Amino acid sequence: MMKRQELMELEDEKLIWACVEPVIQKVRGRSGLEKLQVFRKLGDGQRALFMFQVLHGHMEHGINGFYDQVSYLAEQMNIWSALKSGMRYLGFDAMIDLIGKMEDDYARKADGRADNAAAEELDDIYRNLIPSAIRGVADRIRSHPEDFLPGED
């Protein structure tokens, strides 16, 4: 594991990944119940960071790709509530609003009422918000490293 000072000097996205990767390694390939157990053991900061990475990592292929990837989480936990809670902890009100709109769009899609224009708009909003969100998360990690840095098991 890197030393704290080395972590703090990383570029923003690399810093976020270095802090969240140990959690991702713990849940990768596990059952939904096992993932939920790991999630519940995290501190508030680590939980928020994990949810940020769930959003950011799964949005790589757009909103519909995100929906496809997280549908399994919706079965095990209230993914929408967890995402909003994470963004609230990180202080990203605009992301909370976006997640609420995503939740509504996801429900419409699940009911067979997909709205491609709405999905494209949500993609655009996300792309506009994510650069400042990444900076904000990295700044928060640097300001309060004890809340986010991986601990020893």
Set out the residue ranges of the language-model regions.
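Extended, alpha-helix-rich binding/interface surfaces that flank or overlap catalytic cores
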Residues: M1-I79, G86-D153
